[in-house]
Amino acid sequence: TGEKTEYLAGDMEDAQQSLSDYPTLIYDGPFSDHIMSAQPKMTSGAKEISKENALDAAAAFLGCDKKEISFLSEESGNVPAYCFSHNNKTVAVTKNSGYVIYMLDSSFAGEAKLKTADALKKASEFLSSHGYADMKESYYSTSDGVCTVNYAYKKDGVIYYPDLIKVGVNLETGDIASFDAKGYIMNHTERNLSSDILPQAEAQKSVSGLLTVLELRSV
């Protein structure tokens, strides 16, 4: 099946790279190169939860009874997690704080029945329903019947590209096929932006004359 990548609002990022011991979704360009060795900002120093509490978090995320979920294993590394399974889905919950770090549905995606616009809407609604309201779409990639949408955190008009979340939508069924919040958990924190921001006119002067500026934004 061919792969198609579309960039939303002109964002230029690479698509797809396999991360060892982690579900393959979309490569995050320069933001992912350091992820495997950095300390997660959202969980570092936080209290470790029990496996039972992690099970509750997994059940709430999947919207099912926790009795239907099976424990799989524990993940180590810079973001230790408890892994569970439910039908064709695997979900991992961080040992510290109890955030769902990823979910992957291995169900086969057949012939696409959903339009891309509808898939983007479903992905955004899914994020909002799980407490991620301030997220901005940057691009999407369609491969093997799944549309995976990349989001970055946005606040007060500023887009924080390191705070990444990816959501995959099965284009046949409309179900959520994947969720990857590792970039967000690794990088998200409250920030105090400097008032010394480069003026747009000055920023444009630094752009090569061979390029055409299409849009200006704070990042």
What spans do the regions from the language model cover?
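Long, terminal "pre-/pro-" and other extracytoplasmic accessory regions
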Residues: T1-V219
